[in-house]
Amino acid sequence: MRLARLLRGGTSVRPLCAVPCASRSLASDSASGSGPASESGVPGQVDFYARFSPSPLSMKQFLDFGSVNACEKTSFMFLRQELPVRLANIMKEISLLPDNLLRTPSVQLVQSWYIQSLQELLDFKDKSAEDAKTIYEFTDTVIRIRNRHNDVIPTMAQGVTEYKESFGVDPVTSQNVQYFLDRFYMSRISIRMLLNQHSLLFGGKGSPSHRKHIGSINPNCDVVEVIKDGYENARRLCDLYYVNSPELELEELNAKSPGQPIQVVYVPSHLYHMVFELFKNAMRATMEHHADKGVYPPIQVHVTLGEEDLTVKMSDRGGGVPLRKIDRLFNYMYSTAPRPRVETSRAVPLAGFGYGLPISRLYAQYFQGDLKLYSLEGYGTDAVIYIKALSTESIERLPVYNKAAWKHYRTNHEADDWCVPSREPKDMTTFRSS
């Protein structure tokens, strides 16, 4: 609980600067003496940096920065301001979680990682960008922070599971935790994107097999190739467990440039995460729904590139799910899986937490896309991934801590303003006419 109290400050939120001027205001506040140096300790530092909105970058900006005269000094100057802002914004929201959730060892551990990373970044706020040693040490720090945060997602997930097992879940808490985790994990994806870009571009350990990548971005990401890779790896798991697997039927249509391969500027690992998760779900449903028949319908994938959207539709005949359960598939608090142990980052990611679909949807939404499920109970499910076709429109979707966010945690959610149907029909014979 000490960490929770440490991070809790006042509840008032100052007006946030517009994105274009956020960095300038941050720099000028620091120079004028109203910056974090004049604040006391971690709470003051968090309060100061949380006053500013994160600056969302487009895929084109990521690409242009990394491909045209990539400058480590420029990256240093941007990240030493932007990373504390992103960390502080979400740290303010962590402190608004229920006390019993904040007391769990796993959430305490996550908080300690964020505090340590913020403090390490602030060590560079007054250092010269002209000093080669400073730039080298900063890159080292970025890599260290990235590695420290490897297990943030499963560790926070374990904290939620610990809380649910000890205290149960009421509708209001469930709604607030769902709201928080969507924002927390989206923030984590965005922070990791910045850390990865800097460390891959300037850390000197880029993969030789990915020489055409700009950091983690492939300017010509072959969508079909990533889909096939995800299918093959999911199929291996399916074969191990069920000793069989459904075939893949894949169709592609490039409506934008007919006859050309479907390629977009994207992060292949993000797309892989989404399709791998969807393939696993589709295969499991298909194998179990048709177990008594011994014949397994193929999984059909349609890939279409239009002027605005790249769309991937995956269709299975795994029996589908009822409409009332669709939203639960994206609910972090709903998973009934037994609690797994978080031991090392080499373990199967998120195994047993039931977080595959909600995290996949966040990856899709991160650059203004989406992931949706459409199910026909008794027949099968269509999963559709939407990705922006233009790199200028693929812009980071970032949470910001402001009055609206604060009110969401502090407002008592009122009862629904629609009638709740009773489980049994009313006995109309009990009503007498006067």
UniProtKB/Swiss-Prot annotation:
In alphabetical order, the GO MF annotations are: ATP binding; identical protein binding; protein kinase activity; protein serine/threonine kinase activity; protein-containing complex binding; pyruvate dehydrogenase (acetyl-transferring) kinase activity
Phosphothreonine occurs at 336
| Modification Phosphotyrosine occurs at | 136, 241-242
Record's superkingdom? Eukaryota
User: Which residues carry the post-translational modification N6-succinyllysine, per the record?
Assistant: 403
What modulates its activity?
Activated by binding to the pyruvate dehydrogenase complex subunit DLAT. Strongly activated by NADH plus acetyl-coenzyme A. Inhibited by dichloroacetate.
Q: Which residues are ATP-binding? A: 277-284, 316, 335-336, 352-357
**UniProt xrefs under Gene3D superfamilies:** Alpha-ketoacid/pyruvate dehydrogenase kinase, N-terminal domain, Histidine kinase-like ATPase, C-terminal domain
EC numbers for this chain: 2.7.11.2
**Binding partners and assembly:** Homodimer, and heterodimer with PDK2. Interacts with the pyruvate dehydrogenase complex subunit DLAT, and is part of the multimeric pyruvate dehydrogenase complex that contains multiple copies of pyruvate dehydrogenase (E1), dihydrolipoamide acetyltransferase (DLAT, E2) and lipoamide dehydrogenase (DLD, E3). Interacts with phosphoglycerate kinase PGK1; the interaction is direct, occurs under hypoxic conditions and leads to PDK1-mediated inhibition of pyruvate dehydrogenase complex activity.
Q: Which family does it belong to?
A: Belongs to the PDK/BCKDK protein kinase family.
Function field: Kinase that plays a key role in regulation of glucose and fatty acid metabolism and homeostasis via phosphorylation of the pyruvate dehydrogenase subunits PDHA1 and PDHA2. This inhibits pyruvate dehydrogenase activity, and thereby regulates metabolite flux through the tricarboxylic acid cycle, down-regulates aerobic respiration and inhibits the formation of acetyl-coenzyme A from pyruvate. Plays an important role in cellular responses to hypoxia and is important for cell proliferation under hypoxia.
| Protein name as it appears in the record | [Pyruvate dehydrogenase (acetyl-transferring)] kinase isozyme 1, mitochondrial
Q: Which organism is it from?
A: Rattus norvegicus
Task: Give me the gene this protein comes from.
Answer: Pdk1
